[in-house]
From Swiss-Prot:
InterPro entries: Ribosome_bgen_Alb1. Keywords: Cytoplasm, Nucleus, Ribosome biogenesis, Transport. Involved in proper assembly of pre-ribosomal particles during the biogenesis of the 60S ribosomal subunit. Accompanies the pre-60S particles to the cytoplasm. It comes from Scheffersomyces stipitis (strain ATCC 58785 / CBS 6054 / NBRC 10063 / NRRL Y-11545). GO terms for cellular component: cytoplasm; nucleus. Pfam families: Alb1 (PF09135). This is Ribosome biogenesis protein ALB1. Residues 36-55 have a biased composition (Polar residues). Residues 1-55 are annotated as: Disordered.
Length: 157
């Protein structure tokens, strides 16, 4: 037999089960009565049957044509002319900002060198290096073999 304060006492088990059952019944009744929201349904449920979140803008959804289907609750899903004009004006400003951003990116790309410029610069470097090699073989450049210092430019004593 379980001790006096045991969690597994038969009386506590029966009461806990009854309590959980009552809470489950209330939860099911609430789910049947209220329309389902995006947060109360699974992620694979039909989205069109769910009510919008309070943070979702109904006006923007109506303006873009993405308004959800009615969920049984009477709602006013009209968009006033004033609000529609405001949304159109804001959309125009958003498009303008996007276009200005693209223009600034193009202005900054002025110093991009083309393939021809890169090849011509490479040819100049090759030509200069080969002239040094040819002049060295002819004896025009004197290389000091007994020079002091290291290849890192630090003098060693």
């Amino acid at each position: 037999m379980a001790s006096k304060n045991s969690i597994n006492k038969p009386k506590i088990k029966i009461n806990a089960h009854s309590h959980a059952k009552t809470l489950g019944r209330k939860r099911a009744a609430r789910a049947r009565k209220n329309p389902s929201t995006k947060s109360s349904t699974s992620r694979y449920a039909e989205v069109s049957g769910t009510a919008t979140k309070p943070s979702d803008s109904t006006a923007i959804a109506l303006y873009t044509g993405e308004a959800p289907k009615p969920t049984g609750v009477v709602t006013n899903t009209t968009l006033s002319n004033k609000r529609a004009k405001k949304l159109a004006r804001n959309q125009k400003y958003i498009d303008q900002r996007k276009n200005e951003g693209l223009g600034k990116e193009h202005e900054m790309d002025v110093e991009v060198e083309t393939e021809e410029q890169r090849q011509s610069r490479l040819e100049q470097i090759k030509k200069a290096l080969w002239s040094v090699v040819q002049n060295q073989s002819e004896g025009l450049y004197k290389v000091a073999v007994d020079a002091e210092g290291t290849t890192l430019g630090v003098q060693a004593f």
